[in-house]
Amino acid sequence: MSGLQPPRGTHDLIGETMRRHHHVVETARRVLRTYGFEEWSTPIFEDTRVFSRTLGETSDVVSKEMYTFEDRGGESITLRPEGTAAICRALVTNGLTQSLPQKVFYHGSMFRYERPQKGRYRQFHQIGAELIGAESPLRDAETIAMAQDILRELGLGDHVTLELNTLGDLASRQAWREALVAYFRDHADALSEESRVRLEANPLRILDSKSEQDRKLLDAAPAFADYLNDDSRQFWDGLRSSLQAFGVDFVENPRIVRGLDYYSHTAFEFVTSKLGAQGTVLAGGRYEGLVEQMGGPAIPAIGWAGGIERLAMLLDSVPELPAGIALVPMGDEAVLKAASIARVLRSAGLRAEIETRGNMKKRMERVVKSGASHAIVLGDEEIAKNIVQLRDLSSREQQEVPVADLARILSAGRA
């Protein structure tokens, strides 16, 4: 193939791919608004500290995957690798920390330097939601139920499973972390090289390891459930009972963890077996220190993000564009009249195109091939009477219609 190609790990959104993308976003937007969420948009790039502070200097995202550069003013800038940190930054920047709760959703491009594979790109798109100022397990459950409603509206309810875990509070995690570190140190020789590095920097990330030798050790590692204090158990019980009240089914998975201290209590993933190893299509959890890291007060929140590409790949079908209406003018004066009619039809929300190439036969062949529902034919005789010939391309019926009635007739029932 000749010519310039898009960079590795990126792709063009055109045709059906774009329609699928748009359908995911519009479906999610519709559901999110029924829950009272408002759309925000943040810059596609931020001060690098927005992400290095929140994701952790030792995380894979910060150390290996971020697109970071120095701009001409000498500032370190990073293309956003995820959306939550920027939303929390925007909350603080715009003085909204005293106006809680804030129900926010967003969508857009994210960037990570990863190995491209099915459903995973270096420029990818996410849609996410954050309920900032959420203190109860009921709000966590409601936010998860909202995500499930989106998946159901997309027709994916039967293709995904909700996996759920508790991360407890900070005191519970510290007790568990100490037990884990002691266990891993006792078995350090059996850890993979990467996990030995993580043992010193962030031992909880060993739990995310895909290494077979690490997985064997993890099977016998201290169980977090044994280290939950009373407050954490109460929150965990409240979350599960609230999910049941919302009618949300789930499977408990103790291996769902988050490696940063500001995550707490709720962690969840919606997973599918239809995308191979990259089975997570939407994931989230509760966090309690992220706003504080942006210079605001300590505010609890619950949020999630879903990969639009992965969700789009799972769709069985996507709504087609509405059939258009083709105007077929014959003669220079008719072309100008067709332009005027097209403007009126478009103002009424109808899709209208003007066909001017070739003779009448060629024009009608192209109109039929385009999938238009109706053809509007006009020439000098029709202009003189201020009418058009309206042809239904399915039934092949044709009728004379006054120009003034066209938009009403087509809007009411496609004639």
From Swiss-Prot:
SUPFAM superfamilies in UniProt: Class II aaRS ABD-related, Class II aaRS and biotin synthetases
UniProt-listed InterPro entries: aa-tRNA-synth_II, aa-tRNA-synth_II/BPL/LPL, Anticodon-bd, Anticodon-bd_dom_sf, His-tRNA-ligase, HisRS-like_core, HisRS/HisZ, HisRS_anticodon
Localization of this protein: Cytoplasm
Assigned EC number: 6.1.1.21
Pfam families hit by this protein: HGTP_anticodon, tRNA-synt_His
Entry keyword set: Aminoacyl-tRNA synthetase, ATP-binding, Cytoplasm, Ligase, Nucleotide-binding, Protein biosynthesis
Gene Ontology MF terms: ATP binding; histidine-tRNA ligase activity
Root EC class: ligase
A Gene Ontology BP annotation from the UniProt entry: histidyl-tRNA aminoacylation
Keyword Aminoacyl-tRNA synthetase: yes
GO cellular component terms given for this protein: cytoplasm
Catalytic reactions of this protein: tRNA(His) + L-histidine + ATP = L-histidyl-tRNA(His) + AMP + diphosphate + H(+)
Assembly: Homodimer.
Similarity comment text for this entry: Belongs to the class-II aminoacyl-tRNA synthetase family.
Name the UniProt record assigns to this protein: Histidine--tRNA ligase
Organism: Gluconobacter oxydans (strain 621H)
Gene that specifies this protein: hisS
